[in-house]
Amino acid sequence: MISDFNVDPTAFYNIYKTRDTPENIKSLLCEGNESGEGVMQCFEIAPGIQITYNDLNMDSCFRPLRFEKNFLQINHCLEGCYECELEGGAVSFLGEGDLCVDYLSKDKQVFLGSRIPLKKYRGITVLLEMETAQKTLDNGFQQANINLEQIKDRLCSDGRSLIIKSKHEIDHIFSELYSVDERIQIPYFWIKVIELLLFLSLLDGSSVRHPQQFSADISKRTQEVYQYIIENPFMKETIPDLACMFGVAESSLKR
């Protein structure tokens, strides 16, 4: 129930303003613009560790941001897709069932922009403030021997995002997070965060890849195709037809 949350109408980027001692177990962040609105339900699991449920029905909620601390951010997409603009003008996508691991450094602007092409994105973000979260893990679950720096160095060694395509272990972890009983949410979240980090600690190269990147021109043409489909729902054109109409390769549209 929304009434159970402390409503904060400010920007979504409040999730990056971490505290050593969480003040609110749950909070609700609401934001809107001319393209739509979105809601984030945030749960502070422990110092430096947060889970956010994202329900965004808008074409963008991006604002440039310099982080005050270093974060490991893990995003899982349940529905829709999310597009990020990277340095050099390339664009990458997070699609349904994918898991994305990002290292957000206070010394570097990682993302130059973002869009929600379908104006629909539902998913979960696990956010760990590196220093504080490591202390929490060492004190609360030392037997797991989880090292966030090692996870970051192995999965995001060159500063880029990492995409892990949908697989059984990911589906198992997150399917239960989307349906957990409210009465046991916080302790259950803690268990699932540990499970997720242990899973990431064991990943090898066969399960991971860097996000597919597209040039700004291909991204723009693909968006024009999408808009054409939305405006002409009963169209008869095939993918080859659309590729020819908009001057983009069939392989790019299929991806």
Q: What kind of feature is each model-predicted range?
A:
Residues 232-236:
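Short helix/strand-capping hinge loops at secondary-structure junctions
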Residues 85, 94-215, 239-240, 244-250:
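Alpha-helical bundle regulatory/interaction domains
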Residues 40-41, 61-65, 88-89, 110-116:
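Catalytic micro-motifs at enzyme active sites that drive phosphoryl/nucleotidyl and oxygen chemistry
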Residues 1-69:
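N-terminal low-complexity or simple alpha-helical regulatory segments
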Residues 218-226:
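Short, leucine-enriched amphipathic alpha-helices that occur as contiguous helical runs
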Residues 53-55, 73-75, 122-129:
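Short hydrophobic beta-strand segments that form the core of ligand-binding sensory/regulatory domains
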Residues 68-90, 97-99, 129-130:
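Glycine- and acidic-residue-biased ligand/ion/polar-headgroup-sensing regions
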